């Protein structure tokens, strides 16, 4: 018998087709806050009601945020038990860590269980796990905790991504694509779970950028299952992951920073984040869609991380997008706020559900090609080219 060549081994290891999203699940904590009531609640719980001018500013931020409600694990009871979390800069990392190391994997499990149920295959067929969170750090990590909580095989190959920030919903899909396409038969469970217990803090008039975060961020977890060469007798493909790229925007150092300190995770934003993103977004689009021969940005479907309303407004204006292009993105911002890495996966879920409800021809609002954008610290941009699948009547 002739020896097998390295080329033959490599060929046998690789999948034939592109990585495909096969299922999506989402979860939120039970507790939620309405944006209209939040300024009163926030200034009361942080004992800051004497800061009347700042409260007015915060109220305007909340009014302009385009957010209707946000889910939060932190209840009034938890905050009353941990007064240091309500200060602007008080040592509170231990208390925050104690919450997130338990709650982040737990919320991730809820989303993952929904995705696995929709997928329809036994969980023993999951070969790889990618877990992503900006909330807390621990060893062994959330990837290990989730493996135990779900009862995955101990031999599942795990990847733990901490402290990536808002672009990471694109990063996890990029990594899942590489794993699925280079390991024949691989089924990758991807989980993004975010809880604001690390970033919640009281107001201060010298750092309005911190206050912006308090007006935008919410809690949520999303999970997807990614694999190539789907078994269509059981699996239901939703989107193909055609290409994935990451870049650091020019002249954007320090535009978004996060620092883990004794006081928790502090966020710093420059005012011109929307301008930096909108100015550079077309370059990323051209690089991604040039090879496919697409240059009309209204001819594709859109999933964009909703960092805040100003980013969406400026991208829409710069690219002359029709209002309906960011419908799914704006809906998720309105109903959940900015859930960091989990957002784009919530938007994918929203889009495929709406397309099915409205009888559209494909999972991409009736269109074939689409883009998924993640924006975050760096400024880092993730660009994923998606191909929708026809919706069977």
UniProtKB/Swiss-Prot annotation:
Gene3D superfamilies, A to Z: 3.40.47.10
Class in the EC hierarchy, top level: transferase
| Pfam families listed in its UniProt record | Chal_sti_synt_C (PF02797), Chal_sti_synt_N (PF00195)
- Give the catalytic activity: (E)-4-coumaroyl-CoA + 3 malonyl-CoA + 3 H(+) = 2',4,4',6'-tetrahydroxychalcone + 3 CO2 + 4 CoA
Q: Which SUPFAM superfamilies match?
A: Thiolase-like
The residues annotated as the active site are 166
Query: What cystine pairs are annotated?
Result: none
Cited PANTHER family: CHALCONE SYNTHASE, HYDROXYMETHYLGLUTARYL-COA SYNTHASE
Entry's family note: Belongs to the thiolase-like superfamily. Chalcone/stilbene synthases family.
Protein name stated in the entry: Chalcone synthase 3
Species per Swiss-Prot/TrEMBL record: Ruta graveolens (Common rue)
Q: Which gene encodes it?
A: CHS3
């Amino acid at each position: 018998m002739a020896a097998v060549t390295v080329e033959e081994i490599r060929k046998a290891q690789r999948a034939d087709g592109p990585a495909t999203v096969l299922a999506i699940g989402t979860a939120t904590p039970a507790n939620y806050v309405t944006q209209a009531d939040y300024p009163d609640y926030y200034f009361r719980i942080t004992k800051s009601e004497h800061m009347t001018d700042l409260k007015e500013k915060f109220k305007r931020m909340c009014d302009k945020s385009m957010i209707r409600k946000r889910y939060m694990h932190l209840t009034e009871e938890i905050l009353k038990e941990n007064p240091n979390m309500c200060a602007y800069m008080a040592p509170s990392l231990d208390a925050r860590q104690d919450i997130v190391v338990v709650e982040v994997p737990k919320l991730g499990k809820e989303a993952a269980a929904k995705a696995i149920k929709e997928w329809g295959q036994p969980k023993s067929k999951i070969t790889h796990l990618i877990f992503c969170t900006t909330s807390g750090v621990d060893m062994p990590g959330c990837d290990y905790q989730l493996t135990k909580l779900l009862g995955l095989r101990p031999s599942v190959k795990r990847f733990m991504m901490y402290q990536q920030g808002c672009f990471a919903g694109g990063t996890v899909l990029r990594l899942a694509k590489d794993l699925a396409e280079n390991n024949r038969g691989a089924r990758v469970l991807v989980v993004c779970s975010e809880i604001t217990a690390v970033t919640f803090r009281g107001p201060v008039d010298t750092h309005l950028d911190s206050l912006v975060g308090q007006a935008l961020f919410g809690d949520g977890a999303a999970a997807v299952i990614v694999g190539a060469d789907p078994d269509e007798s059981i699996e239901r493909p939703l989107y193909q992951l055609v290409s994935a790229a990451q870049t650091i925007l020019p002249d954007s150092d320090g535009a978004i920073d996060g620092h883990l300190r004794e006081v928790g995770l502090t966020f710093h934003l420059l005012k011109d984040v929307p301008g930096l993103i909108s100015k550079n977004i077309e370059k990323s689009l051209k690089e991604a869609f040039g090879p496919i021969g697409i240059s009309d940005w209204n001819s594709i479907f859109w999933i964009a991380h909703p960092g805040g309303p100003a980013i969406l407004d400026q991208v829409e204006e710069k690219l002359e997008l029709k209002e309906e292009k960011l419908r799914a993105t704006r809906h998720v911002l309105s109903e959940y706020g900015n859930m960091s890495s989990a957002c784009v996966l919530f938007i994918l879920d929203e889009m495929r559900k709406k397309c099915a409800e409205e009888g559209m021809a494909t999972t991409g609002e009736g269109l074939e090609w689409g883009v998924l954008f993640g924006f975050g610290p760096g400024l880092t941009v993730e660009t994923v080219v998606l191909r929708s699948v026809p919706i069977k009547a």
